[in-house]
Amino acid sequence: MTEVETTHMNAGTESQQEPAELAEKQKAIGNAFYKEKKYAEAIKAYTEAIDLGSDSALAIYYSNRAATYMQIGEFELALCDAKQSDRIKPDVPKTQSRIRQAYEGLSILNEAEVYLKNKQAGLALNALDRLQRRIDSTTQPPMSWMYLKAQVYIFQNDMDRAQKIAHDVLRLNPKNVEALVLRGKVMYYSGENAKAITHFQEALKLDPDCTTAKTLFKQVRKLENTKNQGNDLFRQGNYQDAYEKYSEALQIDPDNKETVAKLYMNRATVLLRLKRPEEALSDSDNALAIDSSYLKGLKVRAKAHEALEKWEEAVRDVQSAIELDASDANLRQELRRLQLELKKSKRKDHYKILGVSKEATDIEIKKAYRKLALVYHPDKNAGNLEAEARFKEVGEAYTILSDPESRRRFDSGVDLEPGMEGGAGMDPFDILRAYQAGGSFPGGGFPGGGFPGGSYNSQGFGMGGGFPGFTSFQFS
């Protein structure tokens, strides 16, 4: 601990003796308070000594008050007093040391502010810890330090610690404007915008010229209004305009991680409605990068993965959601559904084989089959084993999807075990012959006993001029 000076200065003339003696008494009182670590009382006593003391004694009084300011972290006030002491009595080693220490403290404080401005939170906290070690451990640091540390915690999204600092200050002084602004900022960055607005309004009642409160009040209202406009547009089914509103809101305050996560999640939901699942996945990833335990974000990302048929990822997201909320029966039902889709994805996908969507009509399925059967038929691919395999695959897919009951069972996932899919072993040439026969094949054939369009060129492709036993086929 910095020691105060106790040297007694001799009084001058008799007219100066009485105030000088009073000044010395105040200095002694200040020294006693200093030793008891009652720094506020010590500062008051030294101030009275300065007001009463003679010029020859002022150097010690200023130096002692500087030492006291140092103990509570008021380095700027300490520097002013130490410099004043040095002007009155230059080159005193103890005074020079206090000037140096005050400059060092101010330099570290400036470091912390620069680090925070550059978003280097870890370095900012390190600087503040170094400052803390320079003052008496029993004293509360200056409000400016506490406010700065709370700012760092907000940047780190550690709202509990930031909230505690604001609470501690307001407990001591409920009308502290800086603390009200700080607590409002914590509320704001915790996503509690209504409470934040209340705190900023209270701060502005106490200090209408508080620039920080004014700026934050306007910002939170703008962000909240823009977000709500997006929500209203979404409820109205106006998804493109909702997307644009959420995008606008995301630009207002990128540092408000809590609200930004919600906005990303909202925009991801809109993107799913707009059939843009890749972008929805990116937005939900961004939301979860901010908060990995964001339940709604996990649900939305699971939907994005589902839309992209990334079943394993969708299952993992729902499992993570269940870990966060094990009581949600809907989540467990969703997990079972996605696990079934995952199993279905590991079997042969007849829709993909035919190149049609799962919503394809019977006519679309038949057209797709005809086109692929022409491409891979052995007449066109003599000796090509890969084409022969694809030809069989196409026939098998058509066998399943052209029959309503088989298709229903396939879609529902009933037939997941090998060998359970109806018609799986049917000869692909029999499928073609069904067209010629006029529709004995499950699900019916094309009108007129074959593909639309008339007769097949008898010159054919190698195997006797065309498909075996099939004469009414035309390539397109």
Curated annotation (Swiss-Prot):
Domain J: 349-414
Stretches forming TPR repeats: 23-56, 59-92, 143-176, 177-210, 223-256, 261-294, 295-328
Cited Pfam families: DnaJ (PF00226), TPR_11 (PF13414), TPR_2 (PF07719), TPR_8 (PF13181)
GO biological process, one term: protein refolding
PROSITE patterns: DNAJ_2, TPR, TPR_REGION
UniProt entry tagged with the keyword Repeat: yes
Compartments, as annotated in UniProt: Cytoplasm
PANTHER family cross-referenced by the UniProt entry: DNAJ HOMOLOG SUBFAMILY C MEMBER 7, DNAJ PROTEIN P58IPK HOMOLOG
Name under which the protein is recorded: DnaJ homolog subfamily C member 7 homolog
Organism: Schizosaccharomyces pombe (strain 972 / ATCC 24843)
